[in-house]
Amino acid sequence: MFSSIYGYFNSEGDSNQQQNNNNNSNNNLKESVFHSGISNGIIETVGNTPLIRIKSLSEATGCEIYGKAEFMNPGGSPKDRVAREIILDGEKKGLLKKGSTIVEATAGSTGISLTMLGKSRGYNVQLFIPDNVSKEKVDLLEMLGAETKIVPIVGMNNANHFMHCAYQRCLGDDMAFYANQFDNLSNFNAHYNGTAKEIWEQTKGDVDGFVAAAGTGGTVAGISSYLKEVNPNIQNWLIDPPGSGLYSLVNTGVIFHPKDRLVVEKLGPRSFYEGVGVNKKTENFNKASLNGAFRGTEEEGVDMAHYLLKHDGLFLGGSSALNCVGAVKLARKLGPGKTIVTVLCDSGHRYTSRLYSKSWLNDHNFQVSDLSNLNFVK
């Protein structure tokens, strides 16, 4: 069985033969994951991740808090689902062909997934990455074979924003395929048809609330939309990091209040959280079905990551920690006896030089709180 990205992987045979077979195999790929016990390449190992009861949070809140262990996908994140859907859809539409280059703007995880799955299908991969991404992720992307372009963090109105750079790269190049994870609805579909249905089946329909952070919006939108359809009483909430405008969008209908706009448009999100928090309403996020939004701080995320490692042996990344902060806030809002689900979207392996580095934490004025209780969640 494939473990996360730290295992070896090879291309699925000769690339010429792959391209001839891609279109014929797409439907089979979507149906056969894990069914036979033998996977036809890495692309079939995506999904069907465990749902983990987080004991410490459950006991402290009086709710049942579960984490969907998406870090156990072969590429280490839920972006494997998105990459698979985007690639298979691109092949089906004839947009991906022999010699194509997949181009994307990514904070790392989508890039890892696109590179692994793209290489396994015989494609080149070029990634535009904001400069707040951890060195571990960039090194890994290059090791996996991606061409990386590191660009400064700037506001969405700046032509040098990493999303604009990726889009411009593809103009006029028929062999360049813009994955466009932010607005490509294959992202939403991957979670609506996959992750959400798995959660519903694993909980046997016993879900009172769902909470997660959003970047592209595909995970939150796909899961919240499906859960709301099967049970309109489910409470779906967003947890949003500093510098992101989605908290305001959900609660007030506008991305920013005027007093915040100039600062954020100039600097962009300042948070160390990778892959979550944006200042743009994406096509994927537009399909979300949310009841409200919480704000989560950097300090809460740091403390939660260390709390879960100490009490549950869960070695999680920043985005997963933020989601767990959201789970505690939602549990407090709904009250004891409820079942809350969130997404454990990344492991701590890609954060060893930052979130789990004493020197980095000290340099950035973070001090881990008393981890005997959840008082650090405000």
Curated annotation (Swiss-Prot):
Stretches of Low complexity bias are at 15-28
Tell me the domain of life. Eukaryota
Entry binding sites for pyridoxal 5'-phosphate: 215-219, 319
Keywords, sorted A to Z: Amino-acid biosynthesis, Cysteine biosynthesis, Pyridoxal phosphate, Transferase
The terms under GO molecular function for this entry are: cysteine synthase activity
Name the lineage: Eukaryota, Amoebozoa, Evosea, Eumycetozoa, Dictyostelia
Q: Which Pfam families match?
A: PALP (PF00291)
Catalyzed chemical reaction(s): O-acetyl-L-serine + hydrogen sulfide = L-cysteine + acetate
Gene Ontology process terms (BP) = cysteine biosynthetic process; cysteine biosynthetic process from serine
Q: Which gene encodes it?
A: cysK
| PROSITE patterns per UniProt | CYS_SYNTHASE
What the entry lists under InterPro entries is as follows: Cys_Synth/Cystath_Beta-Synth, P-phosphate_BS, TrpB-like_PALP, TrpB-like_PALP_sf
> SUPFAM superfamilies from the xrefs?
Tryptophan synthase beta subunit-like PLP-dependent enzymes
Span list, region Disordered: 10-31
Question: What pathway is it annotated to?
Answer: Amino-acid biosynthesis; L-cysteine biosynthesis; L-cysteine from L-serine: step 2/2
- What name does UniProt use for this protein? Cysteine synthase
According to its UniProt record, the EC number is: 2.5.1.47
Identify residues that carry N6-(pyridoxal phosphate)lysine.
79
Q: Which family does it belong to?
A: Belongs to the cysteine synthase/cystathionine beta-synthase family.
Instruction: State any GO CC term.
Output: cytoplasm
List required co-factors.
Answer: pyridoxal 5'-phosphate
Q: Which organism is it from?
A: Dictyostelium discoideum
In terms of NCBIfam families, this protein maps to: PRK10717.1
